[in-house]
Design a protein with these regions (language model features):
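His/Asp/Glu-rich mid-to-C-terminal helical/loop segments that flank catalytic regions of hydrolases
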Residues: 199-231
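Mid-sequence, gly/pro-rich, charge-dense loop/helix-turn segments that line enzyme active sites
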Residues: 80-164
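Proline-aspartate-enriched helix->loop->beta-strand connector
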Residues: 67-72
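Short, acidic/turn-prone active-site loops that include or flank metal/cofactor-
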Residues: 29, 50, 93-96, 194-196
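A C-terminal functional module that forms or caps the active site or interfaces directly
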Residues: 151-199
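Alpha-helix C-terminal capping segments
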Residues: 61-65, 81-84, 178-187
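N-terminal short beta-loop-beta anion/metal-coordinating cradle
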Residues: 1-65
Length: 231
């Protein structure tokens, strides 16, 4: 099988990239793909860039060019609710927090003609959960919401929390990746490490913890690939 792995920033994928054997680099437009073997599994690692449009275009290219059996979205996220920095978030579903077509009878966050939420593949998510549980960091399993904003405003944070009370984390790509996978019939999973608390500490806190959070999520993804290779 071949697995696609998507991260938005170099610091989120760097430890994965340097672990790929026989790595072949391909550039398509502004996107960079790294193809090879990681812990016995064929992978295509993709640097998507930040934000929903870039993530969607990148995911489409990944699927069309490489036809992966599974797509993993990894990296970092802003924590919501009872999460803390360096906790792990594993999504059971992802939604857009910056979409509103409720005037036409849709739920808040639901794109027109799309489901209210994009559900992570249950089988692969359970396998990833079993791997993540081996680590000492707190694991949260639940809803993740996406939008094209870095949430540093407490007011905006409260709006998101009120609208999506089940959300465990907020970030800027997962819903777009998941929607693209839904449209093209490719299973997806999402695992990220919390780099900051949304609405608290803003960019300074983020820059302090993002590197280690990115390494943590990458470590779990590598262990997940190894577990697949062993079966």
């Amino acid at each position: 099988m071949k697995i696609g792995i998507i991260g938005a920033m170099e610091l989120e994928i760097d430890s994965l990239r340097t672990s790929i054997e026989s790595c072949k680099e391909t550039k398509i437009g502004r996107f960079v793909f790294y193809e090879g073997t990681l812990n016995g599994i064929e992978v295509v690692l993709l640097l998507s860039g930040i934000g929903k449009v870039s993530a969607s275009v990148a995911t489409t290219l990944l699927i069309e060019r490489y036809n992966p059996s599974l797509i993993i979205n990894t990296g970092t996220a802003g924590g919501l609710g009872d999460t803390s920095v360096h906790d792990i978030i594993l999504a059971n579903e992802v939604r857009h927090h910056d979409v509103d077509v409720t005037a036409f009878g849709y739920e808040i966050g639901q794109q027109a003609q799309m489901p209210p939420a994009f559900i992570a593949n249950t089988q692969w998510t359970e396998k990833l959960k079993q791997v993540a549980e081996r680590y000492s960091h707190t694991l949260h399993y639940g809803q993740v919401v996406s939008g094209d904003s870095f949430i540093s405003s407490p007011t905006r944070l409260q709006e998101i929390a009120n609208t999506f009370p089940k959300a465990k984390a907020v970030e800027m790509e997962a819903a777009a990746i998941a929607q693209t996978c839904y449209l093209l019939n490719i299973p997806f999973v999402m695992l990220r490490a919390i780099s900051d608390k949304a609405g608290e500490g803003n960019a300074v806190s983020y820059e302090t913890f993002v590197v280690e959070a990115g390494k943590l999520s990458a470590t779990i993804i590598k262990a997940f690939l190894a577990s697949i290779s062993e079966t």
